[in-house]
Design a protein with these regions (language model features):
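Bacterial Sec-dependent N-terminal signal peptides
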Residues: 1-28
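Glycoside hydrolase catalytic-domain context in secreted enzymes
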Residues: 18-725, 731-747, 751
């Protein structure tokens, strides 16, 4: 990170940190809240637990949102609804958002008995993606590749400012699911496959969103989601069933949520799917025993979209919708994204009147919801906050987005040092996504799917446009040969290569979100495979730029490419960042946050068990072992080289409650300045259950000038060596361990 960008982050941090006093979700409600609850009718209480979508009160006329006053009155006055969320079809300007939210709040405060302020909610998952003029960052999978906690926090902080400026104080983010199935269509929304990495990056994002004080006009309430096990569908499809033994659930999927609870995160969203045959929305064990009692979560639990209805219609664990409401509320949900009608409201009221749910149980949820509104400052300052509006647009935000995109880009291959390119090279820029904005942004970008090109602002640039701006005299373009359906004109494309020295092809997968992104396997698009093979016949070196939210199989085309850049979904500054890396204006430093598979049938994470590598040979029951992904977790090349000194330990034995200091010196032995990520892994050589081959325990990112060295220290304790045993207890067992840094290993003992 250069000094200029450090200065920009510092300036933004001063603005954000002005409200930096630590203020977590309140554990005890105030007398004010108790007084309100004591005066509320049952109907008013259940209304606070009801969350509807914007479509229930508004229509779109000539691309303009128009509030239906009669519907709004019905929702707010008759049914006492306390929160609304979402957009109709696409993003809105700040003024449009204000024209939506302010009338709702005005009616709520002027016409309801208790004047409980109204709360608006949104998915701002990689920036404030439903507000025009906002800054869109790389998706979480790209942010995880940066291995830069402070940068992730800064992206979250800017998102909070721009979301609050719209009048929205509740953000359905971040995703804390651990992405251990690379086929899953929401992998790009996760921070990767490792629970430590997800925990570290997730907490950084939460600190950015909430800032220690969500009453500040520059912060929002975060929502850790989707509790729990959502990212492990058995068939790789969104919202599909998962079979997760509890020992695995606790080892790999629970820690990120535990970390977020410890951080004081205000809300949580529930997994839409089911685990071991039980829908999580109906699991009292997970939502109450584990989440509330074990983890100590005090905040609001909200359903995902339509998920109580799905208990009846999809999971088929209740005969009626009313029974589904009974299951979910008794399991522990506080607020239901219904989202279209009042069936939840009506059935819940009936269940209380029938004595099947106690009113005290309703009071618990209402208490948490009102406390959330109080924490957000809604009781004191319910209307638009000018301070947030004034802070909406700053050059520093764009600089942060550019830096995040640059640091996320992962150089997977660079044969014979083809990259960086020089200004003298004549470069053909082509591929189905070279002149597209959708694939730079991916899901949740101005629309749910992010795939409506006309919705993207004119101020944003495609990769082809950046090439035209930066190197007009040496760039050659063949874009008309491609269509969005990946059809291509072979003759025209091959003709264009004749005057080129190097071919840059921008490929991967089209934008998608959630279930529409379901695929049968991770195969690369066959049309794109064909054209890469044809281009390779020209003898010109190929640079493949991958835009994708998950790792599509490139085994067949990798040999034809001299260099491969994985850009993930890099956001609004993605094209400029890709160009900067290609031409050496920025030295790539991204590290894979997942294992890049070689085959669709071999989706193994880096922290697998040794037996996962077993390959049967001729003799029965005799095995060799091999783990050969396309690229391993943590892989990422640089234009410079780094040398590691031998690992030094403060002792060869870690005793009881002591800590062990691990030191290594890293030297930039190349000619260029660069950033390096130092990752520390441990390996348990013997345990009461089969240990993982290694586990990530720490990482640090440093910047080194050519010839510069830095000493890096890690501290580990027995907790860093712990695992969940057969009794579901987290334990650290005595024995031999390895420390692994880069290609070095050193043994130590714990006793």
């Amino acid at each position: 990170m250069n000094k200029k960008h450090l200065h920009l982050i510092f300036c933004v941090s001063i603005l954000i940190g002005a409200y930096g006093c630590t203020k977590k979700a309140e554990e005890k409600p105030t007398d004010e809240i108790e007084k309100i609850i004591s005066e509320m009718t049952l109907e008013e209480k259940v209304g606070q637990m009801t969350n509807l979508t914007l479509a229930t009160i508004a229509n779109e006329v000539d691309s303009t949102v128009v509030i239906d006053t009669a519907k709004l009155t019905d929702v707010i006055i008759k049914h006492h609804v306390g929160s609304i969320q979402n957009v109709l079809t696409h993003a809105y300007t700040l003024d449009e958002w204000h024209s939506i939210i302010e009338p709702i709040q005005k009616l709520t405060l002027e016409k309801t008995r208790h004047k409980i302020p109204f709360l608006y909610c949104i998915d701002a998952v990689h920036g404030t993606n439903y507000v025009y003029g906002s800054t869109l960052f790389p998706h979480n999978i790209g942010l995880a590749a940066t291995r830069n906690r402070e940068l992730v926090k800064e992206c979250g902080a800017i998102t909070a400012i721009q979301t609050r400026a719209a009048g929205i104080r509740y953000n359905f983010a971040p995703v804390l699911d651990v992405g251990r199935n690379q086929q899953w269509s929401r992998l790009g929304e996760t921070f990767g496959e490792d629970t430590y990495l997800v925990s570290e990056m997730g907490v950084a994002a939460i600190r950015g969103f909430e800032g220690g004080d969500v009453s500040s006009p520059l912060h929002v309430a975060a929502c850790m989601k989707h509790f729990i096990g959502y990212s492990a569908p058995l068939n790789g499809k969104d919202r599909a069933s998962a079979n997760i033994p509890e020992i695995v659930l606790r080892e790999h999927y629970l820690p990120s949520f535990r970390a977020a609870v410890n951080e004081g995160t205000h809300t949580l969203m529930v997994n839409s799917a089911e685990i071991n045959g039980t829908p999580v929305h109906a699991s009292k064990y997970l939502l109450t025993d584990v989440l509330r009692t074990e983890l100590g979560f005090k905040g609001v639990v909200i359903t995902d979209w339509y998920d109580i209805v799905k208990l009846q219609e999809r999971h088929q664990v209740s005969e009626t919708h009313k029974d589904a409401v009974l299951l979910a509320v008794n399991a522990g949900i506080d607020m239901c994204i219904v989202p279209f009608d009042f069936k939840f409201t009506e059935d819940l009221i009936a269940l209380v009147k029938e004595g099947k749910i106690s009113e005290e149980r309703i009071n618990e949820s209402v208490r948490r919801i009102l406390q959330l509104k109080k924490d957000l400052g809604l009781f004191e300052h319910p209307y638009l906050e000018q301070e947030a509006v004034n802070a909406f647009s700053k050059p520093a935000y764009t600089a942060t987005a550019l830096q995040a995109a640059r640091e996320s880009i992962t150089l997977l291959k660079n044969k014979n040092g083809l990259l960086p390119l020089t200004d003298k090279s004549r470069v053909l820029v082509t591929g189905p996504y070279a002149d597209a904005l959708s694939e730079l942004h991916g899901a949740w970008s101005y629309s749910w799917q992010g795939n409506i090109e006309k919705l993207y602002p004119d101020s944003l640039h495609t990769l082809a446009e950046v090439f035209k701006k930066e190197t007009p005299s040496t760039s050659i373009f063949d874009l008309s040969a491609w269509t969005k359906s990946n059809a291509w004109n072979k003759g025209a494309l091959i003709q264009a290569t004749r005057s080129a020295d190097i071919i840059v092809i921008c490929a991967g997968e089209a934008a998608y979100a959630e279930t529409p992104g379901n695929i049968p396997d991770l195969a690369f698009d066959s049309s794109q495979v064909s054209i890469i093979k044809e281009l390779a016949k020209t003898g010109k070196p190929i640079v493949l730029v991958l835009l994708e939210g998950r790792p599509r199989i490139i085994r067949e085309i990798e040999p034809y490419c001299s260099a491969i850049l994985l850009a993930y979904w890099p956001g609004s500054q993605g094209a400029q960042a890709i160009y900067d890396v290609l031409y050496g204006k920025y030295n790539p430093s991204g590290k894979l946050p997942f294992t890049y598979p070689r085959y669709s049938g071999t989706l193994i994470t880096y922290d697998h068990k040794l037996l996962d590598e077993a390959i049967e040979i001729v003799e029965p029951y005799s095995y060799t072992y091999e783990f050969n992904p396309q690229y391993p977790f943590g892989h990422g090349l640089s234009y410079t080289t780094f040398e590691y000194s031998p690992i030094k330990l403060s002792a060869d034995t870690l005793v009881a409650n002591d800590s062990l200091k691990i030191s290594v010196k890293v030297t930039n032995t190349g000619k260029l300045a660069g950033q390096e990520v130092i990752e520390l892994y441990t390996r348990d050589m013997f345990a009461s259950i089969t240990p993982c081959v290694k586990r990530l325990r720490g990482f640090e990112k440093i910047n080194l000038m050519s010839g510069e060295s830095k000493n890096i220290d890690f501290m580990i304790s027995k907790n860093d060596l712990a695992f969940v045993n057969q009794e579901l207890k987290t334990v650290t067992e005595k024995g031999t361990f390895e420390i692994i840094i880069s290609n070095q290993k050193v043994v130590f003992y714990y006793k």
